[in-house]
Amino acid sequence: MNIVPLSQAPPEFLEVAWLADACKLLMGVGWTANYIGMIYKSIKDRTYGMALMPLCCNFAWELVYALILPFDSGMEKWVHVTGLAFNCGVMYTAIKFAPGEWAHARLVQRHLTWIFIASVAGWMSAHLALAAQLGPSLAQAWSAYGCQLLLSVGGLCQLLCRGHSRGTSYLLWFSRFFGSLVLIPQDILRYKYWRRDHEWMKSPLYLWFVSIFLILDGSYGILLWYVRRFERETAEAENRKRR
């Protein structure tokens, strides 16, 4: 991500800037595919595919950094505005089908729309507060890492708690994982060729974020395989009983 305007970049980075831009574009492709896939799966399975709090945090981030504190780069603006547009569809299907997943908690089920609204507003205030504290350029990066961590943990917890794979798929997992993974080479390019303004990328916290993302999101694919195998075994056992 452009923590400092590209106009301040050294000549050696400008020579490889197209590679960093390609990574950003691939990120947009991955996440756009994920959003479209989530909308389709939500309608097909009549559920939602991303845990409630991470979904609201991610949507709030896109509202803040696509509309309120937009990026300097024209390409980054386009990527995030496009992502926000598709994410509106994800939010709509989540609000529409979420009640079906909360029959065990009637109080939550009855007030889900207000819970979504309050959660988005709360996360927007958090993103804006961090921007006021660190400055928008640095805050958008750190808050994006925080969103990713919440998405990774929330996805694992949701899959474990539900015990079924409705609302998700290998394609949804891979598109999300790939969309975030391709930003790591971009960060490496910035650190290697534009180190003066990207020293923070060697900080323990940044390295921890990257490591925990790889562990958690990689684990999701394994857990999804296990849950699907369990579903198949359960279905086969039920069929044998009927015979």
From Swiss-Prot:
- GO BP terms: terpenoid biosynthetic process
Per its record, what are the GO molecular function terms?
A: lyase activity
Q: Which family does it belong to?
A: Belongs to the paxB family.
Give the record's keywords alphabetically.
Lyase, Membrane, Transmembrane, Transmembrane helix
Instruction: Tell whether tRNA-binding is among the UniProt keywords.
Output: no
EC supergroup of this enzyme: lyase
Q: How is it used?
A: Diterpenoid pyrones display various biological activities and FDDP C shows anti-cancer and anti-HIV activities. FDDP C also shows inhibitory activity of 42-mer-amyloid beta aggregation that is involved in the pathogenesis of Alzheimer's disease.
Q: Which gene encodes it?
A: dpmpB
Q: Name one GO cellular component term.
A: membrane
Its membrane topology is listed as: Multi-pass membrane protein
Q: What is its EC number?
A: 4.2.3.-
Name this polypeptide is given:
Terpene cyclase dpmpB
Q: Short name of one Pfam family for this protein?
A: Pyr4-TMTC
Q: Which residues cross the membrane?
A: 13-33, 51-71, 78-98, 112-132, 141-161, 169-189, 207-227
